[in-house]
Amino acid sequence: MAMGSASCISLVVLVALATAASGQLSSTFYDTSCPRALVAIKSGVAAAVSSDPRMGASLLRLHFHDCFGCDASVLLTGMEQNAGPNVGSLRGFGVIDNIKTQLESVCKQTVSCADILTVAARDSVVALGGPSWTVPLGRRDSTTASASLANSDLPGPSSSRSQLEAAFLKKNLNTVDMVALSGAHTIGKAQCSNFRTRIYGGDTNINTAFATSLKANCPQSGGNTNLANLDTMTPNAFDNAYYTNLLSQKGLLHSDQVLFNNETTDNTVRNFASNAAAFSSAFTTAMIKMGNIAPLTGTQGQIRLSCSKVNS
């Protein structure tokens, strides 16, 4: 996870460094050093998603929570994993570890955990019927992680639109990027504790029948980890139904529905709801931008032997 800037000057420097670093990434990075890398990642993801369709959303979320600074810091045991937005909810570590073990057996200390996670996120979307995109490669792995930075950088389920925009802008992602990346909630589930307030009177911008249906598995007390689909229409398909849900006030999280609530983002939501191709194009563009946030390249960081711990 990349560190936030302390001043306008440092922000300019960080953006410049991030741009320079992303320029060192290349889609052909492993063509010679580990030519089967992408095939191995795709195979590992396909098997995992076939066994558990929810795993696709979990890997995509894992990438998002790492890629407010794409350095595989979120994969390190403890620290960042214990941050509020992550604790008890991140999944997919075993899938990444298995892929890493396979790659280490054929390409010793060559393919970074950061790249594995970035490619796995893309392959998860594809496995669930979503669009594909070319992933620039060559990231290296961090040797540290920070729970405090995760707490301060990652938006939460109760975030307002302005809070979401501020969090994304901090990472050089614009409002369209924000709305497009939120569309990842077309797959996956959320815990009751993250939407309880919304369905029990905390929000007025919610479909009454939708709220009632959610209460059956999310009581006012207890059941914090009970799950509900983020997209009730097509929960295991990566499509644009998320935005259709928002038009009907059926966004599961407060941070979902604020994107369509007499806000400046309303027209973008309408566009994505009616035009799947527009959503796919914006989503892939935003994913590439997010994957290029402050990567470690060259001699920075390391190539971990195990994704869960730094090299000894």
From Swiss-Prot:
Glycosites: N262
GO MF entries: heme binding; lactoperoxidase activity; metal ion binding
Keyword Glycoprotein tagged: yes
Main location: secreted
Site (Transition state stabilizer): R61
EC number(s) from the headed UniProt entry: 1.11.1.7
InterPro entries: Haem_peroxidase (IPR002016), Haem_peroxidase_sf (IPR010255), Peroxidase_pln (IPR000823), Peroxidases_AS (IPR019794), Peroxidases_heam-ligand_BS (IPR019793), Secretory_peroxidase (IPR033905)
Note on cofactor: Binds 2 calcium ions per subunit. Binds 1 heme b (iron(II)-protoporphyrin IX) group per subunit.
Active-site positions on this chain: H65 (proton acceptor)
Cofactor(s) listed in the protein's UniProt record: Ca(2+); heme b
Tissue expression summary: Root.
Pfam families per UniProt: peroxidase (PF00141)
SS bond list: C34-C107, C67-C70, C113-C307, C192-C218
GO biological process annotation, one example: response to oxidative stress
Catalytic activity: 2 a phenolic donor + H2O2 = 2 a phenolic radical donor + 2 H2O
An example Gene Ontology CC term for this record: extracellular region
Modification type Pyrrolidone carboxylic acid: residues: Q24
Binding positions for substrate per the UniProt entry: P155
Binding sites annotated in the UniProt record for Ca(2+) 1: D66, G69, D71, S73
CDD domains to which the protein is assigned, alphabetical: secretory_peroxidase
Cleaved signal peptide residues: 1-23
Domain of life, per lineage: Eukaryota
Family: Belongs to the peroxidase family. Classical plant (class III) peroxidase subfamily.
PANTHER family, per database record: PEROXIDASE 2, PEROXIDASE 72-RELATED
Task of the protein: Removal of H(2)O(2), oxidation of toxic reductants, biosynthesis and degradation of lignin, suberization, auxin catabolism, response to environmental stresses such as wounding, pathogen attack and oxidative stress. These functions might be dependent on each isozyme/isoform in each plant tissue.
Name of the protein this chain belongs to: Peroxidase
Lineage, uppermost ranks: Eukaryota, Viridiplantae, Streptophyta, Embryophyta, Tracheophyta
